[in-house]
C-alpha cells in the first residue's frame, strides 16, 4: 500500500509539472499573439495613414487647379488653396496640412546668377540684383554687414556650377574639406532650404530666422508674388526695395492689400514711397501670380501619423506637375 501511495504521489507531481509547463507555453503564446496583433494593427494604421496623406495630396492638387481655372492671372491668399488650419475628418482619424506659395519668398538659387564680364565679386556695388536684395534681407534680420556679405557669397559658391571663389568673401571646397567631418560644396542649385545648414556661417539660430523668408526653386530666376507675401514678412518687401522703403511702409501696404489681391503690380508699387524706376532690377522680380507650391500634410489614424511634403509646379494650360515628394514616414 505505501508503494502504491508513493506511485500515486509521483504521478500527481508529473501531472502538475505538465500543467505548469502547458500554462507557461500558453501564456507565452498569448503574449506573442497580442504582440503580433499590435504589430499588425500598427502596420495597418500606418498604411491607412499613408494612403490618407496621398489622398490629401490629390485634394490639394485639385484645389490648386481649380483656383488656376477660376483666375489664371492672379494667385492670392484669398483663394481656396491658402486656407489655414483646415481639418478634414476621415474614418478613424483626420487630415491636416497647409499649402505654401514658394514664390512668396526669396529664391536662394537666384544667387547662382554669374557675374557680368569684367565685374569683380569684391565690388559690392556692382553685384547682380538678387545678391543686393539678399544682403538687404539679412540686414533686415539684424545680421551684421560683413557677416551678410560673407554668407551671401558662401551661398553663391554653394549654388554656382564652378569651384572658383566668387569673391574673397566666398567659400568653396577648400574651406569645407577642413571641417570635421569634411565635405564638398554642392556646386548646383539647392533642392531644399535645409541645405542652408551646410553652408558656412549658417547657424541653427540664423537658419530659424531666415526660414520664413527663403525657398529653393529649380530655377535661378527671382520672382516674388506680392499677393502672397504676408504682413509679417514685410522685411522681404523692404529687402526687394533695397532698403529704400521703411518696414512700417511695407507693413502698411501689405495690410491694406485687397482680399483678392492686386490684379497688377502697379497697384502696389504706386503705394510705395520709392518709385519703381529708382531700383534697377525690381520691376522684373515683382509678380501677381505664382507657379510653385509646397504642401505639408499630416494624416492621423488612431495614434499613428504619416507626414508628406510635396512640391508642385504649374505647367502649361494651368496643369499641375509633381516636382518632388518627401515621405516623412509614420510615427
Curated annotation (Swiss-Prot):
Sequence ranges on the Periplasmic membrane side: 28-331
Q: Whose protein is this, by species?
A: Aeromonas hydrophila
Q: Which Pfam families match?
A: T2SSK, T2SSK_1st
InterPro entries linked to this entry: GspK, GspK_central_sf, Pilin-like, T2SSK_SAM-like_1st, T2SSK_SAM-like_2nd
Gene transcribed to yield this protein: exeK
How this chain assembles, per its entry, is:
Type II secretion is composed of four main components: the outer membrane complex, the inner membrane complex, the cytoplasmic secretion ATPase and the periplasm-spanning pseudopilus. Interacts with core component ExeG.
PANTHER family from the xrefs? TYPE II SECRETION SYSTEM PROTEIN K (PTHR38831), TYPE II SECRETION SYSTEM PROTEIN K-RELATED (PTHR38831:SF1)
| Flavoprotein among keywords | no
Query: Gene3D superfamilies given for it?
Result: EpsJ-like, GSPII I/J protein-like
Q: Where in the cell is it found?
A: Cell inner membrane
What keywords is this UniProt entry annotated with? Cell inner membrane, Cell membrane, Membrane, Protein transport, Transmembrane, Transmembrane helix, Transport
* TM ranges: 8-27
- Entry protein name: Type II secretion system protein K
Task: List the propeptide residues.
Answer: 1-9
The entry sums up its family as follows: Belongs to the GSP K family.
Q: How is it modified after translation?
A: Cleaved by prepilin peptidase.
- GO BP field: protein secretion
Q: What does this protein do?
A: Component of the type II secretion system required for the energy-dependent secretion of extracellular factors such as proteases and toxins from the periplasm. Plays a role in pseudopilus assembly and seems to control its length. Interacts with the pseudopilus tip complex that is critical for the recognition and binding of secretion substrates.
- GO CC annotations on file: plasma membrane
